[in-house]
Amino acid sequence: MKNGEILEVTVKEIKDNTVIGLVDEQNVYVRAKDISLLEPEKKYFGFLYLNRHGEWCVDTTIPKASLKSFGWGKVETVDHSSGVFVSIGLADKDILVSLDDLPDNSRDWPQVDDELIVRLERDNKDRLWGKLATDEDLISGGFISFDHKFKQNEMVSGHVYHLGKTGVFILLKEGRFAYLHHTEMEENVHLGQEITGRIIGFGAHDRINISLLKNAYARIDDDAAMILAAIKFTPDKKLLLSDSSTPKEIKDKFGISKSSFKRAVGHLLKQNLITSENGYLKIKS
């Protein structure tokens, strides 16, 4: 018998909540979502594993994460000396994703309750390890879907499955790849984290670009919003005011100081909402 095999077990005895089975003439514990459905002397297919007590068990609910397939695993424990332990659905066994397969900086590691997509790997000591999915694994594993039609500024959610040099890669709940550049996040994002962001573009290879920042209009302050509204409601979408305007002209128009005006205009320029040309402030087309 080997860890992670999917094989046939014969139920030998059912007593209270304990089910004993037989695999290759060796006793094993049999796990099931509903043991009342198990019958003595009947054969069942299941997933063979050594539990945390070193006992052989067969779970008749075969986990999606196996030696041949990828599935979701929920982080149960973080151990900075070894890695993170994830649950793949087994009642008394978590799977270790080694620190060798995790980011160098532990601040980028998954945290408890985060989710990872893993496949199992068995080493020469018959131990099971969790291996993280790549783009190719997600495609071949059937995680990708093109059913949903996304729109600009739509809010989407997903889990981080890979950290890149300039940003993070996400698998959306709708089954599409997404990318989050580091300039589009306000704080560190880590592996396995569930995030919700706004679509800001559509990149190559059907990958969606998202942002965790509020859109430009939501990020401007009251002075900037007042100036932007004034420009928008002029007939030709331009306002005869600029850095060269006098404090009195600015005060008469907006009731704010010139320094406040310059700060607000600078914010609007930085957000690419307006332009400043020939003494006019204009809505950027």
Label every model-predicted segment.
Residues M1-S285:
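Single-stranded RNA-binding regions, centering on S1/OB-family and related RNA-binding modules
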